[in-house]
Swiss-Prot record:
This is 3-methyl-2-oxobutanoate hydroxymethyltransferase. Keywords: Cytoplasm, Magnesium, Metal-binding, Pantothenate biosynthesis, Transferase. Gene3D superfamilies: Phosphoenolpyruvate-binding domains. Mg(2+) binds at D45, D84, E114. Catalyzes the reversible reaction in which hydroxymethyl group from 5,10-methylenetetrahydrofolate is transferred onto alpha-ketoisovalerate to form ketopantoate. InterPro entries: Pantoate_hydroxy_MeTrfase, Pyrv/PenolPyrv_kinase-like_dom, Pyrv_kinase-like_dom_sf. The lineage of its organism: Bacteria, Pseudomonadati, Pseudomonadota, Gammaproteobacteria, Vibrionales. Its main location: cytoplasm. 3-methyl-2-oxobutanoate binds at D45, S46, D84, K112. The gene is panB. It is found in: Cytoplasm.
Length: 264
């Protein structure tokens, strides 16, 4: 696989070519994903739940994300690698710069930050300092205590309109990717059409430019339950490599996510 850059993703959006993304946490799986031509990987703070067994992502530290980023980069030298900025690691602009630097030095090509238009100045600051940013909207797991659980976001008109505004504000501030989690497909379509940067969805229908799944969900090995928006590709194929290829192709063809994986 050739080295993937944000410019490739921008070109794919312009060409209407959909792309797949998955979380990764170690060199072995990162290598497997790269061998199957997975273009984008995310070292997610989801590791707190799927690796550490925590009930949410809040305990994850920047040092832990940096460690797993180094592991993933070792296994996948050519993917576009995003790394999550954990809870409160970007509470101030100064903290954001210091912690983003650690993740970029660990091998990330981009950091992912949760938050609406209030985070625009931080994104602008990072972009000006050569740190590409993916802005995460919708269900932002670090806000689980505000939301009262993992709930669908943007179902009423006021919140939907605010999310569109957030996406455009963050793109203007310098975000190079927008990630939408657990939002109605109609809202995801509005945002995907409104933004010039690539939009990645998880639980956001099949109209976004890209899709992302947690690795453990894609292989059906999550400890607790299978989210509505996920699919066990390993059960369908019986082989991990074939499962990865099937996921990539289904995303590219717009077959996944299907109606049963989508919120209205």
């Amino acid at each position: 696989m050739k080295k993937i850059s944000i410019h490739d993703l921008m070109k794919w959006k312009q060409d209407g070519r959909k792309f797949a993304t998955v979380t990764a946490y170690d060199a072995s799986f990162a290598q497997l994903f790269e061998q199957q031509d997975m273009p984008v990987l995310l070292v997610g703070d989801s590791l707190g739940m799927v690796l550490q067994g925590k009930s949410d992502t809040l305990p994850v530290t920047t040092e832990e994300i940096a460690y797993h980023t180094r592991c993933v980069r070792a296994g996948s030298p050519n993917s576009l690698l995003m790394a999550d900025m954990p809870f409160m690691s970007y509470a101030t602009p100064e903290q954001a710069c210091q912690n983003a630097a650690k993740l970029m030095q660990a091998g990330a090509n981009m950091v992912k930050i949760e938050g609406g238009e209030w985070i625009a100045e931080t994104i602008k600051l990072l972009a000006e300092r050569a740190v590409p940013v993916c802005a995460h909207l919708g269900l932002t797991p670090q806000s689980v205590n505000i939301f009262g659980g993992f709930r669908i976001q943007g179902r009423d008109e006021t919140k939907a309109n605010q999310m569109v505004k957030d996406a455009l504000t963050l793109e203007k501030a310098g975000a190079q990717i927008i990630l939408l989690e657990c939002v109605p497909a109609s809202l995801a379509e509005r945002i995907t059409k409104a933004c010039t940067v690539p939009v990645i969805g998880i639980g956001a229908g099949n109209v976004t430019d890209g899709q992302i799944l947690v690795m453990h969900d894609m292989f059906g090995i999550s400890a607790n339950y299978m989210p509505k928006f996920s699919k066990n590709f390993l059960a369908e194929t019986g082989d991990m490599r074939t499962a990865v290829t099937k996921y990539i192709k289904d995303v590219e063809l717009g077959v996944f996510p299907a109606a049963e994986h989508t919120f209205n």
